[in-house]
Amino acid sequence: MNNITKFEDITNSLISRRSLIKKGFAFGGLALMSSTLGSITAYSSQSFFNFTKVDCNNNDTITLPEQYNWSVVSKWGDPMWSDVEEFNQTSCGSHESQLKSVGDNNDGMELFITSDNKTLLAVNNEYTNHKIIFSNRKSLLPENKEDVLKGMYAHGVSIFEIKNSNNQWNLVKDSKYNRRITPFTKMEITGPAKGHSLMKTKEDKDGIYAKGTWNNCGSGRTPWGTYLTCEENFNNYFSSSDKNLKSTNELHRYGIRTREIGLNWAKADSRFDLSKEINEPNKVGYVVEIDPLNPNSTPKKHTALGRFKHENAELVISKNGKIVVYMGDDERGEYLYKYVSNESINKVKDKSTLLSNGNLYVAKFNDNFTGEWLLLDTQTTGLSSKAEVCIFTRLAASKVGATTMDRPEWIASNPKKNEVCCCLTNNKNRGIKTNKGGDKVDVDKVNPRKNNKYGQIVRWKP
């Protein structure tokens, strides 16, 4: 990594909404990283979007220029199979209907085209809004096991066929490709952590599979046509029925608490009870690979890509054919990562193994706008095995002195230039207090603002 782009605080400058769209977004947002406001406004006089200006309003709808229109493709609770009743506005559905319906709170998504020219949409269902999904309850919370299960089934991934008819895209019920992936879907564990003692539970004595995925945030896709879904804020779903259970440094580092916060998943499934399954949290916090074209395939949790609060997974092919995956840990004071496969894409038959065998790196930025990728292995981190590096990736990154960042979220590579960008959301703790691991979160050149409310974009050349 070198030639890190200089950041300037442009948040106090006034940029018109339309100018931002025309000159910033037209170049993938990179114009926002120019060194001065003048270079942004002078970036280009060419108009990339020819549409009528839309005035600001606070109407409870989507307002588009008159040349455009919008429509809903799918929404929470839409049945994916014809044997499921239509969404009931009064009951807000049941756990049985939710299992076969579109999940809640869409986040990352990707389109896939099948060999028979069908269009599939893979959508992350990140979390639930209790005030909506449990609006049939006075408490606006899950009040019994069935309620908890309904909330659980609303998490995960929804994969369904969509079809365009008269300029309206709609979900195709009963498509052979339709699939719900939930916190109960069996998944294969791959990479260094597979079979490690830290992955073994009462249900999985060999530590070779995980049960489900949840809090799926951003996404990614592979050149071989599979979907990558990223597990983010997985920590809030665990609790302990034993109030005397003492937390550990590893649990604390990932924000996993013993106190129940209202989701009550442990009441429906004991694996979320830390006093009964202390290793269960080690099975979540990964990038999960799903083949949307094969609804009978088993999803894979790739531990080689590290365990943290993944935002998205930006996968590119390097000049030597190796797979490179850029990833951000979306929490204040956490890190930016890179994974590089051991083999090149044209030398392996099972392309999925490229995400199981490789090396994990974490970014360190210097004050002269250069940087380096620090290898995370047993020698550099002092951890006893590569499996521990992959399970306790945050601890590993802290040990090598990586640069704490201001919530690294979505990462995107430029398909026409040798550069990568990462959006950093904010960090109210910058220059004020450490992260959960006690790492300094000082003001520096790459994170130049104390109490950073607005974030920044970092660009680097691999």
Please give the residue ranges for each predicted region.
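N-terminal export leaders
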Residues: S16-M33
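C-terminal segment of N-terminal export signals and the immediately downstream linker at the start
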Residues: I10-S16, S35-E66, W70
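Beta-propeller fold recognition
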Residues: K145-G151, H155, Q168-P183, E334-A396, ...
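N-terminal secretory signal peptides
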Residues: M1-S19
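Short, conserved, GDST-rich strand-edge loop motifs in beta-rich repeat architectures
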Residues: E126-G151, N235-I278, S341-S344, N426-N451
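Beta-propeller blade signature
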Residues: H155-K163, G255, K283-P292, Y339-V340, ...
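Beta-rich catalytic cores
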Residues: N105, N215, K283, K309, ...
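Blade-edge beta-strand/turn elements of extracellular beta-propeller
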Residues: T61-V72, D83-S97, N167-G207, I290-R307, ...
